[in-house]
């Protein structure tokens, strides 16, 4: 076979693998987030109670806002 055919085959296979990997990773992350949702206010309240703090609604909102802001930065 000619060299250009091998190069074309390698490029096509590489693109197919990249597309398959992307969609596979996307599906995996969707399932992971469905099974393990991000932290919510109830979980944060329980965590604060375990640490011995009395969680006020203001403090909960403040911590949730800080966590969301940190998540956006990354």
UniProtKB/Swiss-Prot annotation:
Cellular component GO terms, alphabetically? plasma membrane
Q: Where in the cell does this protein reside?
A: Cell membrane
Q: Its topology with respect to the membrane?
A: Single-pass membrane protein
Record has Lipid metabolism as a keyword: no
Top-level division of the source organism's lineage: Bacteria
**Which spans are transmembrane here?**
4-24
Q: Which InterPro entries match?
A: UPF0154 (IPR005359)
Keyword check for Transferase, yes or no.
Answer: no
Keywords, sorted A to Z? Cell membrane, Membrane, Transmembrane, Transmembrane helix
Which family is this protein grouped under?
Belongs to the UPF0154 family.
Q: What is this protein called?
A: UPF0154 protein LVIS_1358
